[in-house]
Design a protein with these regions (language model features):
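Short Gly/Thr/Asp-enriched flexible loops that form oxyanion-binding sites at enzyme active sites
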Residues: 95-108, 144
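FAD-binding core of FAD-dependent oxidoreductases
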Residues: 88-100, 136-140
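Buried hydrophobic packing segments
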Residues: 75, 98-103, 197-198, 218-221
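ATP/NTP phosphate-donor binding region
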Residues: 1-86
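Conserved small/polar residues in nucleotide/adenosyl-binding loops
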Residues: 224-225
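A glycine/threonine-rich phosphate-anchoring loop and its flanking beta-alpha core
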Residues: 108-208
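Conserved active-site and cofactor/substrate-binding residues in soluble primary-metabolism enzymes
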Residues: 15, 37, 41, 45, ...
Length: 225
């Protein structure tokens, strides 16, 4: 038996960021990285759309590349204080991965990081909040997956978090965001996308649903100049 899990809703195409207005809730916390979303005006747009949806909004900013356990704990503490019913992660893989881990800790304050790392052994989420991921790069695809990577810098180890529970409820893939990437990042994330597509096709966990997507992704990346 196999399982193929994707976000409930995947909004894509230019201008799809506007679909934040369709979310229903009272409070949203927006998790972002180093500042590109703010510099390019997308963070302000996201906040405005969430407020238009009737939500109070708070920011958790400056998630570093390869997010740390410490950042996860700080973000979870901010969520516990604010009590959002939507977690909106915006940017590349790092802020989205960090927000997934924060989400677990927010829903289960007593859980340890070691317990969070138990593969496909997480408790049920969505008791307090739902999750929306907005990607700004082409590579990680964490906006549609059941995975995240968090770094313990004291041990010098990157830990994968893996469970269908951390698959986002909503994903927004708006090319307006990706078009602001520097040329070097376009190249790096393009290789990342190609690698993930090849991995998916040769994986022992592949299935009839994943193979066509993987093959099409390989062709699309290889034909893009």
């Amino acid at each position: 038996m196999a399982r193929f899990t994707l976000p409930r809703d995947l909004y894509h195409g230019k201008g799809s960021l506007e679909n934040l207005k369709t979310l229903t809730g009272k409070k949203a916390i927006v998790v972002v990285g180093g500042g590109s979303m703010k510099r390019n005006g997308f963070l302000d747009k996201a906040v405005d759309y969430l407020k238009e949806a009737g939500m109070e909004v708070r920011l958790f900013e400056n998630v570093e590349p390869d997010p740390s356990v410490e950042t996860v704990m700080k973000g979870a503490a901010a969520m516990t204080e604010f009590q959002p019913d939507w977690i909106v992660a915006m940017g590349g893989g790092s802020p989205i991965d960090a927000a997934k881990a924060m989400w677990i800790k927010y829903e289960y304050p007593d859980i340890t990081f070691e317990e969070m790392c138990k593969v496909f052994g997480m408790p049920k989420l969505r008791r307090k909040a739902h999750f929306c991921a907005i990607s700004s790069t082409s590579g990680t695809a964490t906006e549609v997956t059941a995975f995240a990577v968090i770094t313990d810098y004291e041990k010098g180890i990157k830990y994968p978090l893996a469970d269908f529970e951390i698959t986002p409820d909503v994903a927004i893939v708006d090319p307006d965001l990706a078009e602001t990437m520097p040329q070097k990042l376009v190249a790096h994330t393009g290789m990342d996308a190609m690698t993930h597509a090849i991995e998916a096709y040769v994986s022992t966990a592949n299935c009839d649903f994943t193979d066509p997507l993987a093959l099409y992704a390989i062709k699309t990346v290889s034909y893009t100049h």
